[in-house]
Amino acid sequence: MDLLQQLQNQLNQFPSHTKLLLGFSGGLDSTVLLSLLAKLRKKQPHLSLRAIHIHHGLSQNADNWAIHCRQICQQLDISFLCEKVTINPRKGIEADAREARYQAIANHLQDNEILVTAHHQQDQTETFLLALKRGSGLQGLGAMQIQSVVFNLPIFRPLLHCTKQQLEQYAKTEKLSWIEDESNADNRYERNFLRNDILPKLRQRWQSIDNAVQRSAQHCFEQQQLINELLNDEFNKIYDKFDRTLSIANFATYSILKQKALLRTWLQHLHILMPSTIQLDNIMRNMIQAQEDRNPTCRLGNQVLRRYQKRLYATPILQDLSHIRLDIQANECINLPDNLGEICLLTKNEHLQVTWQNKQILLPLTQEKIEIRFRYSGKVKLPQGFHQEMKKCWQDHNVPVWQRTRIPLIFYGNKFKSAVGFFNNCE
């Protein structure tokens, strides 16, 4: 079966995939897939096809590669995007380039559009062996699937069961032109080391190793899917779809293995980087088994796991706002820091109406300076007439500890007046 027919068969299995965004590096693999998709589009005019090239700026040839990719797309009448990204070498070039690449693609992906990549069978072998080197479990050893989600991006890999030799033969027959990335010869990169030094020897000894690895990866994937299916009912009982939190109130009744599996399932639902064995053990010890009065945290990638009242939360990395003070006047709106949105103070019927995140409060008008802060540790006078510590007020409103310094507090001069949307100081 030729490549075009294989591609057609894969697309037939996913009839909803009619808007495609091809990740186009300009290398042999993506050039072959671009050619195949262009041919297929002639047969299926309803197919929407665009290509995106990520300019990493890591090579002195990067500008020429972008020009080459643009020219190829122009020849095929395919809409072309080029996005420049900045790589942070301190995070590791391979990992950061991958993350930056997916983030750039996410910025351009349209509704109902799916990212298409040219991963093939030999790429699958490399991915499997790298996961094995890291000590991955079933999730990691499942490697790549024809359709999956990575960094919240839907990805379609229609060539995953095709060999590199098939792609090379197609490129030769069609007289395609492509770029050669000189970094592919640099064995300091783990994938290159496997590709250039290790796998040729394995293939010389065992000619069918790529097929065998692909079967093993599929077995691992299916076993992980079965575990997810068996855990599904239990998981749904403890997972809150509204705030995406996980209850650990009854975790002590589960085996340690089941606790870890439920944690992984939750992280997978949130598309959070899977923890290493050491990280998972730390989460179990420092978060699940910690004393109830503790507020432990654990960072995973760009997310932070937190615990409050026997539930686990996942939040972005939050800016410390406790020191911030913002002046504001009546009939003024200002933007709050760290993406907290806009707050407005409007005079209305001899009161000051404060609006923030669909919450409203009314305060008396004042001639004093009005200030927004994010921290107060004194006492609050309640409508019932008695005073209560600020901490107890937050607890009564079930506000997690880390959110308490992200709620705007209104001050008249140095006097606390309101935690917007939650409670007022009746002094």
Curated annotation (Swiss-Prot):
Binding-site list for ATP: S25, G26, G27, L28, D29, S30
InterPro entries in the cross-refs: Lysidine-tRNA-synth_C, Rossmann-like_a/b/a_fold, TilS/TtcA_N, tRNA_Ile_lys_synt, tRNA_Ile_lys_synt_N, tRNA_Ile_lys_synt_subst-bd
CDD domains in the cross-refs: TilS_N (cd01992)
Reactions accelerated catalytically: cytidine(34) in tRNA(Ile2) + L-lysine + ATP = lysidine(34) in tRNA(Ile2) + AMP + diphosphate + H(+)
A GO cellular component entry from the record: cytoplasm
EC code(s) of this entry: 6.3.4.19
Zinc-finger keyword on record: no
Family designation: Belongs to the tRNA(Ile)-lysidine synthase family.
Domain characteristics, as noted in the entry: The N-terminal region contains the highly conserved SGGXDS motif, predicted to be a P-loop motif involved in ATP binding.
Purpose of the protein: Ligates lysine onto the cytidine present at position 34 of the AUA codon-specific tRNA(Ile) that contains the anticodon CAU, in an ATP-dependent manner. Cytidine is converted to lysidine, thus changing the amino acid specificity of the tRNA from methionine to isoleucine.
Protein name: tRNA(Ile)-lysidine synthase
Source species: Histophilus somni (strain 2336) (Haemophilus somnus)
Designated gene of the protein: tilS
